[in-house]
């Protein structure tokens, strides 16, 4: 899936952490209980939210940030049947098991991603990166707003490049309600 540029492959991307890809460095995500080289090393592009003592890697997907802001649902099928996982619950925080990126069980497969109908009539996506193309976000934000008569009625905001999963800003969402 990851090599075919599918939605499922995009959702399942592994971290871009250089310590994950450098097999000479410790990485709890790659080899549990080996340590996290990024903790004391170069960590400019690592998590500022939701990190743990075991891992400070971030999720690389731009698409996932937008899906989180749009309250998407991941449809999954496996030996135990079908289920739906809220997008904000699909990816895991590292905790004590940073090698587990998501909440799929062994043998489960993503079959669909559903974006529900909503009342959002304004949406924005902004990505800050080191170069103009083919670069991961240093930080990104997806914003979806329902605006009526110049007043924000509902808001949904997610950030990327800042956590092990797309990070919802629920406090900011609530703060924006009623603002002009």
Residue ranges and their predicted role:
Residues 1-180:
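C-terminal structural segment of proteins
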């Amino acid at each position: 899936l990851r090599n075919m540029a599918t939605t499922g492959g995009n959702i399942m991307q592994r971290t871009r952490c250089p310590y994950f890809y450098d097999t000479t460095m410790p990485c709890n995500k790659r080899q549990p209980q080996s340590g996290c080289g990024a903790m004391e090393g170069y960590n400019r592009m690592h998590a500022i939210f939701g990190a743990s003592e075991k891992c400070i890697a971030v999720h690389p997907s731009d698409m996932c940030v937008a899906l989180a802001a749009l309250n998407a649902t991941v449809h999954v099928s496996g030996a135990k049947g079908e289920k739906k996982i809220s997008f904000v619950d699909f990816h895991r925080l590292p905790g004590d098991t940073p090698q587990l990126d998501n909440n799929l069980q062994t043998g489960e497969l993503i079959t669909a991603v559903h974006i529900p109908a909503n009342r959002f009539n304004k949406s924005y996506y902004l990505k800050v990166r080191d170069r103009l193309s083919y670069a991961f976000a240093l930080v990104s934000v997806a914003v979806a707003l329902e605006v009526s008569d110049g007043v924000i009625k509902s808001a949904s905001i997610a950030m990327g490049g800042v956590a092990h999963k797309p990070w919802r800003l629920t406090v900011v969402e609530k703060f924006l309600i009623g603002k002009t």
